[in-house]
From Swiss-Prot:
Transmembrane spans: none
GO molecular function: large ribosomal subunit rRNA binding; structural constituent of ribosome
Similarity comment: family membership: Belongs to the universal ribosomal protein uL10 family.
Designated name of the protein: Large ribosomal subunit protein uL10
Gene giving rise to this polypeptide: rplJ
Originating species: Frankia casuarinae (strain DSM 45818 / CECT 9043 / HFP020203 / CcI3)
GO biological process: translation
Annotated Gene Ontology cellular component terms: large ribosomal subunit
The entry's keywords: Ribonucleoprotein, Ribosomal protein, RNA-binding, rRNA-binding
Length: 187
């Protein structure tokens, strides 16, 4: 590979790193071309899976400001550059690795934080961002409804007490008005 080609390849990988929310490094030794194609389909549109040269990718990672991946650039390496939801990509890689043991997760980074292969597997066990946000919104809605009930209860109690006090005063004033009339009739 000529120096100009290497420079262009590094620049392309730098852009991939900078444009990605996550990147997962894998070892693909033993996978066929059809299996790699199947993996790319399984990862979906938000993820680009590329076989890379370790030296060039290491240089590109340094230039992109991605740290903590140096030990992972050993053996045949492919990188899943994730521009969408990292959880969905991690699930796709985990599930494919279960079905095809030749695919080995090495590690990667998510939102700038280096992650081990075990951490990526744990990430895959999480629910997607949309599901977590929906659950949070539901919990907040329930909490707010409960708070409204708590605030409304004392107000309704005060209203009932005020009504009872008004009725009691009306009853007393009617009783006081009847007393002078009864005294006048007795005289």
């Amino acid at each position: 590979m000529a120096k100009a080609e290497k420079t262009a390849a590094v620049a392309e990988i730098v852009e991939e790193f900078r444009g990605s929310t996550a990147a997962v490094l894998t070892e693909y030794r033993g996978l066929t071309v059809s299996q790699l194609t199947e993996l790319r389909r399984a990862l979906g549109e938000g993820t680009r899976y590329s076989v890379v040269k370790n030296t060039l990718t290491k240089i590109a990672a340094e230039q992109a400001g991605v740290t903590g991946l140096d030990d992972l650039f050993v053996g045949p390496t492919a990188v899943a550059f994730v521009s969408g939801d990292p959880v969905e990509a991690a699930k796709g890689l985990r599930d494919f690795a279960r079905a095809n043991p030749a695919l080995v997760l090495k590690g990667g980074f998510v939102e700038g934080k280096p992650m081990t292969a075990d951490e990526i597997r744990k990430l895959a066990d999480l629910e997607s961002r949309e599901v977590l946000l929906a659950k949070l919104a539901g919990a907040m809605k329930g909490t707010l409804a409960g708070a409204v009930g708590l605030f409304a209860a004392p107000l309704s109690q005060v209203a009932r007490l005020a009504e009872a006090l008004r009725e009691q005063r009306e009853g007393q004033s009617a009783g006081v008005a009847e007393q002078p009339a009864a005294e006048a009739a007795a005289e």
